């Protein structure tokens, strides 16, 4: 891993972002599509009123949906867009099984609905580094979507929707008398859902008067007079790649003296081919500035190439680089 001194990263807070004006972001109405899969999904119904019995039964237990009972769903996030991750899906809710034609004990309403709930999706890398959190609110019916109301980490300020929970195997309904430490042993449902997200910001390659901030190993800017070759190791400078380890607070500059590798998966495609990302991390002294070292893939055509940077499954605006 090599961290280079760059004239393209301005140290003063906020100055870095002003270099992005020359770029065109993806269309505002083009959502980022993310599919999340989870396992061991269990619904715990708050039907245990003797406090001495809560979370004591080794299980498995069962429960029945009843009006006004508090419920809590939990599952283990296992993939995002097919990529292995870790994480927790949790969802507290108040059970209100609304019905247009209710049976005794069921609340009446104009539509059949399960009532409102909130979902929290905390996503980590496969080795446990924090990527980000998505928060949504919604109901199983009648609307087709849950509304994404915010996020943190790589998903800071995110809005959007996600569709219905699709269960490949049914969620297990349990009682709050059951010991939740045994959830994985007892098993549960397998689910997937697809998010359609509108990011507050995207990963972007910094724009300079001479073109995108992509340089050769000697620090020289890639240009028509100095094109890139297949297999060459390049460095690009960017914003919006999300949290790092160690963590740096929002709005604070990356300190000197340490490497700050990005937590989220980072991908660079040239004409649709993935490059080998050698290092992606915060750039010392910059606010939201990052350096990415990568190897150009084989088989790129001579002339120009379209380079697209993606972080946390969020694509940035493509930029054009000269190739040979």
Place the predicted regions along the sequence by residue.
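Positively charged n-region of N-terminal signal peptides that target proteins for export
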Residues: 1-5
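Homeobox/homeodomain signature
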Residues: 9-10, 145, 218, 311
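Bacterial N-terminal signal peptides
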Residues: 7-21
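Preference for short coil/turn "hinge" residues that link or interrupt alpha-helices
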Residues: 9-13, 148, 221, 293
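Beta-strand-enriched cores of mature, soluble protein domains
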Residues: 23-202
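A sequence-level detector for low-complexity, Ser/Thr- and acidic-rich stretches
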Residues: 24-26, 33, 44-47, 51-53, ...
């Amino acid at each position: 891993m090599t961290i280079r001194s760059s004239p393209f990263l301005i140290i003063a807070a906020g100055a870095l972002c002003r270099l992005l004006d020359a770029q065109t972001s993806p269309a505002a109405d083009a959502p980022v599509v993310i599919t999340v899969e989870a396992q061991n999904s269990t619904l715990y119904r708050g039907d245990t009123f003797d406090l001495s019995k809560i979370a004591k039964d080794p299980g498995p237990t069962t429960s029945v949906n009843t009006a006004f009972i508090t419920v809590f769903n939990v599952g283990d996030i296992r993939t995002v867009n097919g990529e292995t991750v870790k994480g927790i899906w949790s969802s507290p809710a108040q059970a209100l099984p609304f019905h247009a034609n209710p049976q005794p004990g069921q609340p009446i309403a104009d539509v059949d609905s399960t009532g409102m709930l909130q979902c929290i999706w905390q996503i980590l890398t496969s080795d446990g580094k924090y990527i980000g959190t998505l928060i949504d609110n919604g109901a199983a019916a009648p609307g087709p979507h849950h509304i994404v109301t915010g996020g943190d980490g790589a998903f800071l300020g995110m809005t959007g929707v996600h569709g219905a929970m699709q269960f490949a195997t049914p969620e297990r309904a349990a009682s709050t008398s059951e010991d939740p430490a045994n959830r994985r042993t007892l098993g549960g449902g397998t689910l997937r859902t697809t998010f359609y997200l509108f990011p507050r910001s995207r990963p972007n390659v910094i724009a300079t008067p001479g073109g995108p901030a992509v340089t050769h190993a000697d620090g020289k800017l890639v240009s028509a007079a100095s094109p890139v070759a297949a297999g060459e190791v390049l460095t690009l400078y960017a914003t919006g790649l999300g949290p790092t380890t160690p963590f740096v607070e929002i709005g604070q500059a990356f300190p000197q003296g340490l490497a700050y590798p990005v937590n989220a998966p980072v991908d660079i495609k040239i004409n649709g081919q993935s490059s080998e990302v050698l290092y992606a991390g915060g750039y010392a002294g910059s606010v939201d500035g990052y350096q990415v070292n990568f190897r150009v893939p084989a088989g790129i055509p001579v002339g120009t190439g379209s380079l697209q940077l993606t972080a946390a499954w969020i694509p940035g605006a493509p930029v054009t680089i000269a190739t040979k």
